[in-house]
Amino acid sequence: MTSPIIVRTVAEMREHVRAWKAAGQRVAVVPTMGALHEGHLSLVRLAQQHAERVIATVFVNPKQFAPHEDFDAYPRGEAADAEKLALVGCDLLFAPNATEMYAPGFSTLVSVSGVSEPLEGAARPQFFGGVATVVAKLFIQSQADVAVFGEKDYQQLQVVRRMARDLDIPVEIIGAPTARAEDGLALSSRNAYLSAEERAAAVALPTAMKAAAAAVAQGGPIEDAERSAVAALQAAGFGQVDYVEIREASDLSRLGPGPIGEASGRILVAAWLGKTRLIDNMAVG
């Protein structure tokens, strides 16, 4: 088992990337905020299928958190993250601090309109500006040929795809299927916040999504499936439901009212269980 090279500056990372590319090797990047779990490791393994060298980045990005959100409480543990990356043979861990990413006087924000505006964009207005900015920087800094993101953050994946296309960033973006626990709950760093009772109740989230997706696939009205999913979550003990919506899969435009027809849809959900906000999504139709 070989530990990944750990670097903290863009200059150090680029030295390694230059050497790899001079040797004719492709480079993949897997951006994360740390607190790595099997879902993240599955992204690294997928990246290894598309490139000879893989960089995992760990940076809890302050620009995507609003003042009232969980930036300070977000789980961190670089040593544990490095050990997990060693198990899957990741080549390099880029772990910058905030000053390395945002030097004094930093004044630029990457704004992606359209696909970023509904759902998470409406619930967390600051979020996607921070995401698009840091991901654009990571693409430029790493000069990666390939980037791998999980479909668990589906809207984020679509925002990043739009941003890279619009800015002509020459990186192939690959979406990886959501990694799930045996009971169907999507793996997430925030699952660590759940009590044992909440963790047992959380399975209602994928269950409600599956039921809604099945109802729509059988020709049921989209709006009825959405309402039924909200009711199922509330009955299971979820408090505030930020959204349950079935949207067009690529641009997240609204579908309905009525049946889905020939459209390719995606159900996207965000809801609170105690003090923990869980998100998930699933293909529909």
Swiss-Prot record:
Pathway as given in its UniProt record: Cofactor biosynthesis; (R)-pantothenate biosynthesis; (R)-pantothenate from (R)-pantoate and beta-alanine: step 1/1
GO CC entries: cytosol
Protein name: Pantothenate synthetase
UniProt keyword annotation of tRNA processing present: no
GO BP field: pantothenate biosynthetic process
Gene: panC
EC number(s) stated in the UniProt entry for this protein: 6.3.2.1
Subcellular location field: Cytoplasm
Source taxonomy: Bacteria, Pseudomonadati, Pseudomonadota, Alphaproteobacteria, Caulobacterales
PANTHER family named among the record's database cross-references: CYTIDYLATE KINASE/PANTOATE-BETA-ALANINE LIGASE (PTHR21299), PANTOATE--BETA-ALANINE LIGASE (PTHR21299:SF1)
Family: Belongs to the pantothenate synthetase family.
Binding locations of (R)-pantoate: 64, 156
A GO MF term: ATP binding
